[in-house]
Amino acid sequence: MNEFQRLCALLKVCYENLLILHHNLTGDPAWKGNHEWLGDWYDMAANQADDLIEIGLQMGYREPTIAESLMIFPALPADNRLWPETQTITMGMFTQLTEQFEKAQTGTPDCVINKLQEYQYAW
């Protein structure tokens, strides 16, 4: 699996993990706002994954399955979490995503690099 495919795999797992965090946020006085942010972030991960997987298919790359993705990147357990823990996990995901976006640019056509940089900036 190349770095572009690893990015697609990471986006799939981040989507699922953000969904878990979204559903299991508890005991937060700012629950509504933080819950909405988590929803926005998992939507963004899903949309970026969809777009980049389709671009990868056009470049001749095979889509990583969720099973393959989970062999590389861990899924979170569906545990209730307070906002400080959720925020720490989320920021770690964002860091991992921005690093993987950087790696995915190697050997990728310029027109795709522009899209990767646009998406990377969003995180």
Q: Model regions: which residues?
A:
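Weak global preference for isoleucine
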Residues: 20, 53-55, 66, 72, ...
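Amphipathic alpha-helical coiled-coil segments and their boundaries
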Residues: 4-7, 31-34, 38, 83, ...
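Conserved alpha-helical segments that form or flank metal/cofactor-binding pockets of metalloenzymes
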Residues: 33-67
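Acidic/histidine-rich alpha-helical segments that form the ligand environment
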Residues: 71-123
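Generic structural signal for well-ordered, non-transmembrane alpha-helical segments
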Residues: 5, 9-12, 16-19, 39, ...
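Conserved phosphate-binding loops in nucleotide/dinucleotide-binding enzymes
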Residues: 1
